[in-house]
Structures are given as structure tokens and as C-alpha cells.
Amino acid sequence: MKKILIFILLLFSFNVVAISKETTFTNDIFEKSQLDGKTTVIHSWNKTCTTCSRQAKILDKAKQEFKDVIFLSFEQTKDKNIAKFLSIDYWTTIVVYRHNKEISRSIGQTNKEKIYSQINSL
């Protein structure tokens, strides 16, 4: 009985951490956003990564506040072709592009103010 209880607790704890996101990045959306001069935020994540989950919550709030910004994401270990295209080697990477230029990049950042500053960077 004790082993079953421990198994259930461990299973539940992993489900709490899991991100229920889907890949929203496509080359077409990214290229169009850059041609239109839009600020584009790209988040690389993994569904079992706690840091990624914290970043996703901050970026979900940012979507509500930054109406003119395009937010795209992808699962880094699953979508390796996207990671290679964007030169992203790590989960927890947030990259901001504007006018076909990379404006800023961070890895592991979970501070809301710093992420918002990254989005606003020129």
C-alpha cells in the first residue's frame, strides 16, 4: 500500500510540472512577422521543465499586455529543426526578433520584469 501511495504522489507531482503547450512556431508566421516589422518573441521549452513552466506563465501574461507582439513557442527536444534554424540549443531560451534581427536572447530567465524588459528592448 505504501509503494502505491508513493507512486501516485510521484505521478501527480510530475503532472503538476508538465506544460500543456503546443508548438505555435511556423516558418510562415515567423517570416511574415519579420517582414511586417513586428516584434516576435520565441520561447523554447520542454513539457517537464519547471523553469519553462514559470516562463510560460509569464509569457502568457505578456501576451495580454503586449498586443502588437507575436508570441511563438516550440518544444526544443521535439522540434529540433526549429531549434537548429534559430540556433537555440537549450530549453528555457527566450529570443526576441524585430525586422529580421535578433534583438535579445536569454536562457533560464524567470524574472517577469527582466523578461518584459527583453520584450521591450530596442
Describe each region flagged by the PLM.
Residues 4-13:
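Sec-dependent N-terminal signal peptides
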Residues 10, 17-37, 118:
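N-terminal leader/targeting and pre-domain segments
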Residues 27, 56-60, 80-83, 112, ...:
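Extracytoplasmic/secreted envelope proteins and their assembly/folding machinery
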Residues 35-47:
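Short active-site neighborhood of thiol/selenol oxidoreductases, capturing the structured segment around
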Residues 44, 68-80:
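Thiol-based oxidoreductase modules, predominantly thioredoxin-like and allied folds used
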Residues 51-65:
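Typically the conserved alpha-helix immediately C-terminal to a functionally engaged Cys/Sec
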Residues 86-95:
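Structural micro-motif
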Residues 98-122:
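Non-catalytic, surface beta->alpha helical segment in thiol-disulfide oxidoreductase systems
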